[in-house]
C-alpha cells in the first residue's frame, strides 16, 4: 500500500502525496475538500470534483508548496481566513449579547473594547470592574487589555495576548478567529447559549502543522487493542495524554483546532473501519436524520447488552488473575490498581480485530498525529454531561472524529457511533470532549471498508502495535499473567492463539462479522481557565481537560502551553509526550488517546512519562513468567528493552504547581529544539527535581553507566508542567527574567559525560530509574552503543530518504525513536508469548524495529548525516516530514506479513544486515560497539555541537520575538518605528538562520560557525531588547506616575486658584472699605479746606469734580499749576457767560500774567536761595504758559466772544507781553481769525465724489416736476447751513426765550423759523388743491416719499417738518384724501409718526440719532427741551453763594452733543433752479384750515 501524506495549500484544500516503497513522489489524482474528508484507498482520494480540474489544481499547488524554515514559516505564514458565515455568526452573537451593532470595518467598530468587555461580564459577571467609555486611544487600549485579562480569568484557553495588536492592525480574520473561539467557549460554559449557526458551516483552512500531525498520529497507531485496553479507552486518559507538549508542537492555533468537530465517546475499539465519502454542503443536514435516529436506538440497546457482557468478562478476568498471582512470583512493578468506572468485556464476547483505518503512516518522524479521516468539518457534538471524576477528555485531534457505522447500520450512521481509532505503542484510546451544542449535525457519509487488500495492509502495519496494546492492558489490569499479556486480539479464542494469529496475517478475517461494542458515552469535565500568557487551546465548541487517577497525584486540569507565534500554534491534542527509555532513548506516545494509569506511574513532566516505562516492565515480567522456555539471552533482551523504555522521572514529583518558566519569555515556549537536560536531572523544559529525584538519578546513573549524557548541552527551558502530577497545567505565570539565560549558557561540560547526541537530537539526558520498578528488581547492565554504528546508521537513514527537503524539529524524531523502542518491547512480547521464538529471533525483531525507527528520507543537501537527519526532524510545520516514518513502518510491516516465525526471523536478519541501528545495539546486547568509531568521532562531535547551537539559535530567536512583541504591546506608538528600523538593520529574513538551504549546503563546521554567529547576534539583540523593555516598562510606570502627579497638580492648582480668588475678593472688599473711609475723611478735610479757599469739590464716580466756587477762583483754576484737566477748559468756555462776562475773564488773565514774570536774583545769594528762586521762577513760567494756551483755545473755538472791545484788549495784551515767544504765538492765532480765507481755501475736500443732482429734462415749472430725492437734498443743504451757524452762547440761559432773543440767539431763531416755514409749505400745498382730490392724494404721496428721502440723509429735522405738516389739523382731517393713498404708504407714514413721537422723551428718535453715521441734522426742538430742563431744574448759585458749576457742566454736555453734528458737513451740490419752489412765504394757519374745509366740508349732523 502506498503511504500518503496530507499537504495543505494556502487555499485550504487537502491534497495527498502518494509515496511508493521506493520513496518516489507522485501526486494523487484528486484532492479532498475541506468539507468532505475521505480515507485514502491505495494512495488515492475519492472526491466528487472533476479529475481534470483536480489535476490542474495539483499542478498549481505543487508550485505553491514552500519548503521554508521554521523561523520563516512563523514570520511569513498567512493567517487562515474565516468565511463570511463565521463572520456573520460572530457579529450576530455580539449583537445578541450586547445589543451593539458591529459594522465593517470590524476592527474599527471593536477598537473601543466596550462591547468586548460587556461580553466578558455576561459570561462571568463582575469580571471587568470598570469599562472606560472615553474616546481616547488610552481608553481603547485599557478596555482591550481588560478584555484580554477577562478571557484568561473566565477560563479561556486561547492566546489572546496579541488581540489588541490585531485589532489596531485591522487584521479582521485573526480577530474573528479569536472571537469565534470565545463564542464557542461561552456556549460551553453557558448551556442556554444557542449557537448562531451550525458548526458544520465552518470553513477554515488548516495549517500544515495540523495536517502533518494528523497523518503522523494515525500512521503510528495500531488498529486493535486488547480487551482490557478497550475497556479503558472510554474511561481514563493515559499519562501520555497529560504529558508535556513539545515547544515546537505546542503552538497549534485555536483557528486550526476548530477545523475538527468533536466526536462521541468511543465505547469500544472493536469497530469496523470506515471511510468518508465527500459530498456537497447542501447534503450535510437532512439526508439521513431518520436513519440516524433509528441507528441510535439500536446502538443504545447494543450498549446495554455489551455492558452486561463486560461485567461478566471482568469477573472472569479477576478470577484468572488471582489464580496466576498464586502461581507466579511477586511482580516487579507496583500493582496499585486504578479504579475505572467502566465495564470490561469477557473473552467470549471479544470480536475479531478490524482492519485499521487507511491513513498515512510514519515511522521515525514526528510522533503519532491525527489521520486524514480525523480531519472533518465539525461532527455533531454530544450534549454536555456532568463530568466523571475518573474520566477526562483527551485533547486530541482524533477526538473530533465522527463515529463509524456498525455492521448493521446504513451508510450514514448515527452521530454517536464510536470509531476505532488507531492507538500508539501505549494503547491510547480516544474520548470525545465535552460539547454544548444541542443541535445535531450530520457528518460526512460513512461506509465500511471491506476490501481485502486494505485489511492486509492495515494488519501488517500494526503487528507490533497489537503487542503494545498488550502492555497497556497489563498496566490497566495490573496483573502480570498470560491472559493479560496475550489479550491483544479481541477474539474469544485462546490468548496465545490470538497473539499468533495477530502476528501472522489477519487478511482472511471477514469484516462483516466484526460488530462494534458500544459503551455509554462518558461525561467530560470542563477545561479550567488558562493561566499564563501565550497559552492556547483550540477554539472548538468543547473544552479539553485531563483527569488523572493516581495514587500520588491529584486531579488537575491541563491547559496547553503554546508559543506566542502566529500561524504555528499546536494544541495540546496534537502535542507529543516524550518518555525516556533505559537506554537513553525516547519513546513517544500521543496525547490523543486515553488509557488507564497505574497508581504509581503518575510522574509527568516534559522529559519523561512513567506510563510507557511501566508498560515495558510489565511486558518483560510477563515474558519471564509465562514463557519459562526463554533463555538468558531472552531475559537480557527484555531487560535491555526495559532499560530502553524506563528512562523517566522518579515517581515522586512535587505535586504543588510550579510554573516558573526557565525561558526569558513567559508568553511562548522557549524552543522546539532538542530536549536537553542539565546534569542535576531536571530537563530544561521541566521543573527542577526535588531531593528524591536526585537520589533516584544517582542510583540510575550507577545502574546505567553507559547512558548517553552530555552535561555541556545548554538547558533549553520550557514551562514546567508537573502541578499535581498533571502536565500542561500552569497555575500562574512568572515574570520573565533575563538572568535565566545563565541557566541556558552557563552549564559547563564534564569530560567524563561527554558523548554524542543520538539521531533524534537527544544531546544529553539523565539516566533515571523507572518509577514503577520495585526494590527487588536488580538493574541489568547495558551494553554501550557503538558510536560508529550509530552514525553509520544515521548515514544509512540519510541515504534512504528521497524526498525530504523541509526541516522539522529534532523533538519529533526523538519521540518517534521512543515509539520504536516500545515496538521493540512489543516484539519481545510476541516472541516470548508464542514460546517458539529464540533469542536470535528476539534480537532480530528488535533490530528490525530499531532500523525502521531510524529510517529517514534522504536529504539531497550535503550536510552531515547525523545533523542533517536531526535537523530535518526539528521542524514540525511542514507536510513532507510525515511520510518518512510512514514508509518505514510500511516496510517493516510488509516484511512481517504472510510469514511464519522462521520467515520473520530470516527477514529480520536480512534487515539487520542492511540497517545497523543504535537501538539494535542497545536492545539486543550486541557487543559490536566500536566499529568505525575513529572515522566518525570528529563528525559526531561537530554534529553534536551543531545540534546544541541550532537549539540555542531557535531559543534565542523566539525569545527575541517575544521581547519585541512585549515592547510593541507595551508602547507601540513610540517604539514600533524603532524596531522596524532594527529589523532592517539586522536583516533577519535575509540572514542565514535556522535550517535554510544556504545553511544546509555548507559543511558542518561552517554550519556551526554560522550558528554561533546567529547566536551571538541574537544574544546581543536580546540584551538590547531586554534593556529597551526595561526602559519601556519604566517609562510606562513613569508616565503613569506622571499622569497621577499631574492630576494632583491640577487639583492643587484648582484649589490654589479658588483660594486666590477668595483672597482677592476679601482683599478688594477690605481695600474698598478702607478707601471709602479714607475718601470720606479726605472729602471732609478737602471740603473744609476748599471752602476756605473759595472752591467746593464733589466726589463722583471715583474722582473729584468741582461743585462750585467764586468767580475769581473758577478763573484762577484755568492757570493753576496744581490743577490739571482739559475738560475744565471746555466746560468753562461753553458756560462762563452764565456767571461772568468775557471782559472780566480777560482782565483777570491779563493781571495774573503780568504779575508772574520771573524774578532775577542777586549774585551774592547763596545756593539755597538761588534754588528757591529758580523754583519760584519755574512756577511763574508755567502760569504764563497756561494763560497763553487758554487764550489760544478761546480765540480758535469761541471767537464770536471777541467783540470790538474785547478784541482791543487782546491786542493790548499781546503788545505788552514781554515773552517774545508767547507774543508771536498769540499774534499768529489772532491773525488766522481776522484775515478772511479765500474761496479756494474754504473749499472742503470729501473722500467720496459729490452725487449728481437729479433734474428733469424740461424746465421746472411746478412742484410735480421735481424729484423727491433732489428736493430732500436741497432742503438738507439749506437747513445745515442754518444749523452750523448757531453759536454755543445761543444755547445758554434760555436765550431763545428771552426778550432780547433776536440779539442773543439770532441763528437759533433762524433755524426755528425755517422749520415752521417748511411745515406750512407742506400743509398749504395740499389744501390749495381744493377741487381735484386725486391731485391732493398725489401731493400727499410725494410728501411721504420726501420724508423717506430725508430720513435716508439723516435729516431728522426735515422728517419732523414733513410729519408736522402732514399731521396738522388742516391736512389730517382730509379723510377722503388719505383714503386715496395705498395702505403701504399709510403704514410708512405711521412709521414716521412713531419716529417723531414724544413718548418716553423721544426715545425712538434718540436711539436712531445715536445709531446714525455721517452728516446729520438733529431736531433742535428735543435738545432745546433738554437745555430748558437743565436750566430750570438747577440753581445758578449754591447755598454759600458760590457759582453752581455742576449746572454749567450739565449745560456744557448738551451743547457738546449739538456741536458734534455741526462739525461734519454734507457732500451735496446746490441747485439754484429749485430754490424758488422750496422757499415761500408762510400761509397763516387759519387760512389753511379754511382751504381744508373747502376741499372736504364738514358733514352736517341731522
From Swiss-Prot:
Ras-GEF domain boundaries:
1267-1498
Q: Where are the compositionally biased (Pro residues) regions? A: 518-528
Q: Give the residue ranges for region: Disordered.
A: 216-242, 325-436, 456-534, 589-935
Domain N-terminal Ras-GEF residues, every copy = 1102-1249
Q: Which GO terms describe its cellular component?
A: plasma membrane
Domain Calponin-homology (CH) positions:
84-187
Task: Give the Low complexity compositional bias ranges.
Answer: 218-242, 325-345, 371-400, 407-421, 458-508, 589-646, 663-675, 686-719, 764-790, 813-853, 883-935
Which InterPro entries does the annotation name?
A: CH_dom, CH_dom_sf, Ras-like_GEF, Ras-like_Gua-exchang_fac_N, Ras_GEF_dom_sf, RASGEF_cat_dom, RASGEF_cat_dom_sf
Q: Which domain of life is it from?
A: Eukaryota
Q: Which PROSITE patterns match?
A: CH (PS50021), RASGEF_CAT (PS50009), RASGEF_NTER (PS50212)
Q: Compositional bias (Polar residues) at which positions?
A: 422-436, 861-876
Q: Which Pfam families match?
A: CH, RasGEF, RasGEF_N
| Keywords associated with the record | Coiled coil, Guanine-nucleotide releasing factor
The record's listing under CDD domains reads: RasGEF, REM
The residues forming a coiled coil are 287-328, 451-515, 1032-1076
Q: Name one GO biological process term.
A: Ras protein signal transduction
Q: What does this protein do?
A: Promotes the exchange of Ras-bound GDP by GTP.
Instruction: Indicate what this protein is called per its UniProt record.
Output: Ras guanine nucleotide exchange factor P
- Native organism is Dictyostelium discoideum
Amino acid at each position: 500500500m502506498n503511504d500518503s501524506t496530507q499537504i495543505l495549500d494556502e487555499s485550504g484544500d487537502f491534497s495527498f502525496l502518494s509515496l511508493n516503497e521506493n520513496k518516489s513522489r507522485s501526486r494523487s489524482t484528486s484532492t479532498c475538500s475541506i468539507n468532505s474528508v475521505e480515507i485514502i484507498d491505495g494512495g488515492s482520494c475519492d472526491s466528487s470534483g472533476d479529475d481534470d480540474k483536480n489535476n490542474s489544481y495539483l499542478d498549481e499547488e505543487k508550485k505553491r508548496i514552500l519548503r521554508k524554515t521554521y523561523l520563516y514559516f512563523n514570520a511569513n505564514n498567512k493567517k487562515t481566513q474565516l468565511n463570511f458565515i463565521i463572520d456573520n455568526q460572530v457579529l450576530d452573537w455580539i449583537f445578541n449579547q450586547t445589543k451593539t451593532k458591529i459594522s465593517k470595518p470590524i476592527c474599527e467598530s471593536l477598537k473601543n473594547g466596550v462591547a468586548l468587555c460587556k461580553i466578558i461580564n455576561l459570561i462571568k459577571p463582575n469580571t471587568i470592574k470598570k469599562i472606560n467609555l472615553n474616546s481616547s486611544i488610552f481608553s481603547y487600549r485599557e478596555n482591550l487589555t481588560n478584555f484580554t485579562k477577562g478571557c484568561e480569568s473566565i477560563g479561556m484557553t486561547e492566546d489572546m495576548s496579541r488581540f489588541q495588536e490585531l485589532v489596531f492592525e485591522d487584521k479582521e480574520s485573526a480577530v474573528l478567529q479569536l472571537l469565534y473561539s470565545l463564542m464557542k467557549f461561552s456556549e460551553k460554559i453557558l448551556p442556554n447559549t444557542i449557537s448562531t449557526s451550525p458548526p458544520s458551516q465552518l470553513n477554515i483552512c488548516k495549517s500544515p502543522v495540523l495536517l502533518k500531525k494528523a497523518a503522523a498520529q494515525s500512521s503510528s497507531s495500531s488498529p486493535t487493542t486488547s480487551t482490557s485496553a478497550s475497556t479503558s479507552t472510554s474511561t481514563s486518559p493515559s499519562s501520555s495524554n497529560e504529558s508535556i507538549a513539545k515547544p515546537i508542537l505546542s503552538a497549534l492555533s485555536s483557528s486550526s483546532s476548530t477545523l475538527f468537530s468533536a466526536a462521541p465517546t468511543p465505547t469500544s475499539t472493536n469497530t469496523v473501519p470506515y471511510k468518508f465519502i465527500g459530498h456537497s454542503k447542501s447534503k450535510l443536514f437532512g439526508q439521513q436524520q431518520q436513519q440516524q435516529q433509528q441507528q441510535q436506538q439500536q446502538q443504545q440497546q447494543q450498549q446495554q447488552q455489551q455492558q452486561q457482557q463486560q461485567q461478566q468478562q471482568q469477573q472472569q478476568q479477576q478470577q484468572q488473575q488471582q489464580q496466576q498471582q498464586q502461581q507466579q512470583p511477586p511482580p516487579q512493578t507496583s500493582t496499585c490498581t486504578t479504579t475505572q468506572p467502566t465495564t470490561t468485556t469477557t473473552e467470549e464476547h471479544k470480536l475479531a480485530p478490524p482492519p485499521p483505518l487507511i491513513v498515512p503512516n510514519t515511522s521515525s518522524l514526528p510522533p503519532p498525529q491525527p489521520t486524514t479521516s480525523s480531519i472533518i468539518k465539525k461532527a455533531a457534538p454530544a450534549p454536555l454531561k456532568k463530568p466523571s471524576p475518573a474520566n477526562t477528555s483527551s485533547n486530541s485531534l482524533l477526538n473530533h472524529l465522527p463515529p463509524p457505522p456498525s455492521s448493521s447500520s446504513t451508510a450514514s450512521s448515527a452521530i454517536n457511533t464510536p470509531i476505532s481509532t488507531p492507538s500508539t505503542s501505549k494503547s491510547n484510546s480516544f474520548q470525545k470532549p465535552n460539547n454544548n451544542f444541542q443541535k445535531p449535525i450530520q457528518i460526512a457519509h460513512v461506509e465500511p471498508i471491506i476490501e481485502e487488500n486494505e485489511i492486509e495492509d492495515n494488519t501488517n502495519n500494526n503487528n507490533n502495535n497489537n503487542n503494545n496494546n498488550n502492555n497497556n492492558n497489563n498496566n490497566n489490569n495490573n496483573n502480570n499473567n498470560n491472559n493479560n499479556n496475550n489479550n491483544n486480539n479481541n477474539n474469544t479464542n485462546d490468548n496465545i492463539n490470538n497473539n499468533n494469529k495477530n502476528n501472522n496475517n489477519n487478511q482472511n478475517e471477514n469484516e462483516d462479522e466484526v460488530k462494534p461494542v458500544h459503551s455509554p458515552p462518558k461525561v467530560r469535565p470542563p477545561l479550567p481557565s488558562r493561566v499564563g500568557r501565550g497559552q492556547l487551546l483550540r477554539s472548538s465548541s468543547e473544552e479539553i481537560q485531563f483527569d488523572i487517577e493516581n495514587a500520588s497525584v491529584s486531579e488537575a486540569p491541563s491547559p496547553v502551553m503554546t508559543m506566542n507565534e502566529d500561524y504555528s500554534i499546536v494544541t495540546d491534542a496534537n502535542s507529543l509526550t516524550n518518555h525516556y527509555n533505559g537506554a537513553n532513548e525516547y519513546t513517544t506516545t500521543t496525547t490523543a488517546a486515553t488509557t488507564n494509569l497505574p497508581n504509581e506511574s503518575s510522574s509527568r513532566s516534559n522529559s519523561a512519562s512513567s506510563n510507557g516505562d511501566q508498560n515495558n516492565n510489565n511486558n518483560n515480567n510477563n515474558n519471564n513468567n509465562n514463557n519459562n522456555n526463554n533463555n538468558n539471552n531472552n531475559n537480557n533482551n527484555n531487560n535491555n528493552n526495559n532499560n530502553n523504555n524506563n528512562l523517566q522521572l522518579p515517581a515522586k514529583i512535587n505535586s504543588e504547581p510550579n510554573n516558573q518558566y526557565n525561558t526569558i519569555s513567559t508568553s511562548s515556549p522557549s524552543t522546539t529544539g532538542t530536549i536537553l537536560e542539565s546534569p542535576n536531572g531536571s530537563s530544561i523544559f521541566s521543573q527542577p527535581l526535588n531531593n528524591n529525584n536526585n537520589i533516584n538519578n544517582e542510583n540510575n546513573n550507577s545502574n546505567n553507566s553507559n547512558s548517553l549524557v552530555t552535561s555541556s548541552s545548554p538547558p533549553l527551558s520550557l514551562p514546567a508542567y508537573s502541578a499535581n502530577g498533571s502536565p500542561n497545567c500552569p497555575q500562574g505565570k512568572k515574570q520573565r527574567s533575563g538572568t535565566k539565560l545563565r541557566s541556558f549558557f552557563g552549564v559547563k561540560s564534564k569530560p567524563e559525560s561527554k558523548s554524542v547526541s543520538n539521531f533524534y537530537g537527544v544531546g544529553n539526558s539523565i539516566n533515571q530509574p523507572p518509577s514503577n520498578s520495585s526494590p527487588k528488581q536488580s538493574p541489568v547492565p547495558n551494553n554501550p552503543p557503538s558510536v560508529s554504528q550509530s552514525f553509520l546508521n544515521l548515514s544509512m537513514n540519510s541515504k534512504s530518504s528521497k524526498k525530504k527537503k523541509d526541516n522539522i524539529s529534532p523533538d519529533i524524531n526523538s519521540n518517534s525513536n521512543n515509539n520504536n523502542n516500545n515496538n521493540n518491547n512489543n516484539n519481545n512480547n510476541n516472541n516470548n508469548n508464542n514460546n517458539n521464538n529464540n533469542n536470535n529471533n528476539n534480537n532480530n525483531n528488535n533490530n528490525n524495529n530499531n532500523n525502521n525507527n531510524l529510517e529517514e528520507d534522504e536529504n539531497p543537501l550535503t550536510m552531515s548525516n547525523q545533523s542533517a537527519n536531526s535537523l530535518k526532524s526539528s521542524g514540525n510545520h511542514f507536510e513532507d516530514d510525515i511520510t518518512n516514518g510512514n514508509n518505514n513502518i510500511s516496510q517493516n510491516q510488509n516484511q512481517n506479513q504472510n510469514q511464519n516465525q522462521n520467515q520473520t526471523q530470516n527477514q529480520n536478519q536480512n534487515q539487520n544486515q542492511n540497517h545497523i541501528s543504535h537501538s539494535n545495539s542497545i536492545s539486543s546486547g550486541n557487543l559490536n560497539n566500536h566499529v568505525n568509531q575513529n572515522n566518525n568521532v570528529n563528525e559526531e562531535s561537530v554534529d553534536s555541537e551543531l545540534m546544541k547551537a541550532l537549539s540555542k539559535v531557535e531559543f534565542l530567536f523566539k525569545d527575541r520575538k517575544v521581547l519585541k512583541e512585549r515592547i510593541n504591546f507595551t508602547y507601540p506608538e513610540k517604539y514600533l518605528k524603532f524596531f522596524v528600523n532594527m529589523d532592517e538593520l539586522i536583516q533577519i529574513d535575509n540572514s542565514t538562520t535556522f535550517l535554510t538551504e544556504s545553511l544546509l549546503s555548507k559543511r558542518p563546521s561552517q554550519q556551526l560557525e554560522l550558528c554561533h554567529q546567529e547566536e551571538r547576534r541574537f544574544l546581543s539583540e536580546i540584551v538590547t531588547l531586554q534593556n529597551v523593555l526595561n526602559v519601556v516598562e519604566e517609562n510606562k510606570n513613569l508616565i503613569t506616575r506622571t499622569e497621577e502627579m499631574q492630576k494632583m497638580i491640577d487639583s492643587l492648582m484648582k484649589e490654589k486658584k479658588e483660594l486666590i480668588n477668595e483672597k482677592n475678593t476679601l482683599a478688594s472688599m477690605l481695600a474698598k472699605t478702607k478707601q471709602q473711609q479714607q475718601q470720606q475723611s479726605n472729602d471732609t478735610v478737602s471740603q473744609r479746606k476748599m471752602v476756605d479757599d473759595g472752591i467746593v469739590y464733589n466726589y463722583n464716580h471715583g474722582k473729584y469734580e468741582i461743585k462750585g466756587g467764586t468767580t475769581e477762583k473758577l478763573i484762577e483754576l484755568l492757570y493753576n499749576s496744581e490743577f490739571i484737566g482739559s475738560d475744565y477748559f471746555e466746560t468753562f468756555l461753553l458756560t462762563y457767560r452764565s456767571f461772568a462776562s468775557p471782559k472780566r475773564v480777560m482782565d483777570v488773565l491779563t493781571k495774573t500774567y503780568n504779575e508772574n514774570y520771573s524774578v532775577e536774583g542777586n549774585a551774592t545769594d547763596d545756593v539755597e536761595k538761588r534754588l528757591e528762586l529758580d523754583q519760584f521762577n519755574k512756577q511763574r513760567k508755567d502760569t504764563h504758559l497756561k494763560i497763553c494756551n487758554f487764550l489760544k483755545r478761546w480765540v480758535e473755538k469761541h471767537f464770536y466772544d471777541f467783540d470790538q472791545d474785547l478784541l482791543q484788549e487782546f491786542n493790548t495784551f499781546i503788545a505788552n507781553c514781554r515773552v517774545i515767544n508767547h507774543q508771536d504765538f498769540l499774534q499768529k492765532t489772532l491773525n488766522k481769525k481776522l484775515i478772511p480765507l479765500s474761496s479756494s481755501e474754504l473749499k472742503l475736500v470729501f473722500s467720496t465724489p459729490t452725487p449728481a443732482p437729479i433734474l428733469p429734462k424740461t424746465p421746472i415749472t411746478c412742484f410735480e416736476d421735481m424729484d423727491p430725492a433732489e428736493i430732500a437734498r436741497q432742503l438738507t443743504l439749506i437747513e445745515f447751513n442754518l444749523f452750523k451757524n448757531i453759536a454755543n452762547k445761543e444755547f445758554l440761559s434760555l436765550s431763545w426765550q428771552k426778550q432780547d432773543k433776536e440779539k442773543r440767539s439770532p441763528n437759533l431763531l433762524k433755524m426755528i423759523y425755517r422749520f415752521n416755514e417748511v411745515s406750512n409749505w407742506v400743509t398749504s400745498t395740499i389744501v390749495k388743491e381744493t377741487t381735484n382730490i386725486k391731485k391732493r392724494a398725489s401731493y400727499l404721496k410725494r410728501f411721504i416719499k420726501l420724508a423717506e428721502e430725508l430720513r435716508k440723509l439723516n435729516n431728522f429735522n426735515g422728517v419732523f417738518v414733513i410729519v408736522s405738516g402732514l399731521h396738522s389739523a388742516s391736512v389730517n382731517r382730509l379723510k377722503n384724501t388719505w383714503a386715496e393713498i395705498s395702505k403701504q404708504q399709510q403704514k410708512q407714514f405711521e412709521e414716521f409718526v412713531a419716529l417723531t413721537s414724544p413718548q418716553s422723551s423721544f426715545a425712538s428718535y434718540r436711539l436712531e440719532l445715536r445709531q446714525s453715521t455721517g452728516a446729520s441734522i438733529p431736531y433742535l426742538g428735543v435738545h432745546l427741551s433738554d437745555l430748558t430742563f437743565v436750566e430750570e431744574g438747577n440753581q445758578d448759585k449754591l447755598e454759600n453763594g458760590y457759582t453752581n458749576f455742576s449746572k454749567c457742566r450739565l449745560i456744557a454736555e448738551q451743547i457738546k452733543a449739538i456741536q458734534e453734528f455741526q462739525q461734519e458737513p454734507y457732500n451735496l451740490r446746490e441747485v439754484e433752479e429749485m430754490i424758488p419752489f422750496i422757499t415761500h412765504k408762510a400761509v397763516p394757519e387759519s387760512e389753511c384750515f379754511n382751504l381744508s374745509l373747502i376741499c372736504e366740508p364738514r358733514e352736517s349732523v341731522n
